[in-house]
């Protein structure tokens, strides 16, 4: 999110984007992937940090988000429920407030859609649904 911007847009389920927005994203992804294949340096995410929160373990989700951030110049903070107080000793709302002050975007892979939505409601940065029992 740009400094001074007040618009926070989350991606919590498929209906959060319109068809033309998906078309734009897929076209941008195609262009970026082609640049990568051509060894063109393209790092628009320099000095940006993604927090990945995993309540549900994953290989492909973690690798795809992490590799994408690094390839585009960003960095990643990987959090698991086993290695943090997320959802246990610390309410999800407090975690959202604190974590979102330190990163530029958050991806969450969790069991409950309501937990994802609660985090997003208290986040200062965009939140992406990495998977819930309801949406993927």
Question: Model-found features: residue ranges?
Answer:
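Phosphate/diphosphate ligand-binding glycine-rich loop within oxidoreductases
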Residues: 44-136
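Positively charged, low-complexity intrinsically disordered leader regions
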Residues: 1-63, 67
């Amino acid at each position: 999110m740009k400094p001074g911007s007040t618009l926070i847009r989350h991606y919590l389920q498929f209906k959060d984007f319109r068809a033309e927005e998906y078309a734009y994203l897929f076209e941008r992804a195609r262009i970026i992937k082609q640049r990568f294949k051509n060894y063109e340096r393209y790092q628009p995410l320099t000095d940006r940090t993604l927090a990945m929160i995993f309540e549900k373990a994953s290989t492909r989700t973690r690798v795809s988000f992490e590799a994408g951030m690094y390839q585009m110049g960003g960095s990643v903070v990987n959090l698991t429920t086993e290695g943090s107080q997320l959802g246990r000793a610390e309410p999800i709302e407090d975690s959202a407030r604190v974590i979102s002050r330190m990163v530029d975007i958050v991806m969450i892979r969790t069991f409950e859609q309501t937990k994802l939505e609660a985090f997003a409601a208290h986040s200062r940065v965009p939140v992406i649904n990495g998977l819930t029992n309801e949406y993927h």
